[in-house]
């Protein structure tokens, strides 16, 4: 992948991951799949939509981690459901998502796109969790290139910030935009 730019690497990694998961039977007709958020997850969603459109996959039910992914699924014909829907029953067969950083021990940072809570809920309720990433996400130790996202409710902002700063953390408030929706 050395001759590809970062965007091309992400697309190749995502498409290859979905193709491999289909070939190995981990993505299959009738499954309930979690679909992640971000620049690597979206090409995976696009490839999944192509399998649905050509009839290779049928009756796939997706639960998404963000407004961004929900819109992409609508545009590309991937049926979206909620954990509240009876056909999902609060459990997914597999989730596929990207990451912000991954170290050699497979520790990772997620949630940098401001969809952390939904990403955690979907991952927790999936039997299998697949992370797709290009080489730019590889680090020797997580937290070296990307800040650790912490999602809190507005009412808890001041006390949580105070406690984190007492522990030596540098806190920066980031308001949800783009992937989180309006």
Model-derived regions: residue spans:
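Active-site catalytic microenvironments in core metabolic enzymes, especially phosphate/sugar-handling
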Residues: 1-32, 37-88
């Amino acid at each position: 992948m050395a001759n590809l730019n970062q965007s091309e690497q992400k697309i190749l990694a995502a498409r290859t991951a979905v193709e491999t998961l289909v070939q190995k039977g981990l993505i299959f007709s009738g499954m309930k799949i979690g679909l992640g958020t971000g620049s690597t997850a979206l090409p995976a969603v696009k490839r999944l939509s192509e399998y649905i459109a050509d009839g290779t996959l049928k009756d796939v039910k997706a639960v998404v981690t963000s407004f961004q992914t929900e819109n992409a699924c609508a545009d590309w014909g991937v049926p979206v459901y909620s954990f509240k829907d009876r056909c999902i029953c609060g459990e997914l067969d597999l989730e596929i998502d990207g990451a912000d950083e991954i170290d050699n021990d497979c520790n990772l940072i997620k949630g940098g796109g401001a969809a952390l809570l939904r990403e955690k809920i979907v991952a927790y309720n999936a039997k299998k969790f697949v992370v797709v990433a290009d080489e730019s996400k590889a680090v020797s130790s997580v937290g070296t290139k990307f800040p650790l996202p912490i999602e809190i409710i507005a009412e808890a902002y001041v006390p949580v910030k105070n406690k984190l700063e007492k522990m030596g953390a540098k806190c920066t408030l980031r308001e949800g935009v783009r992937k989180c929706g309006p």
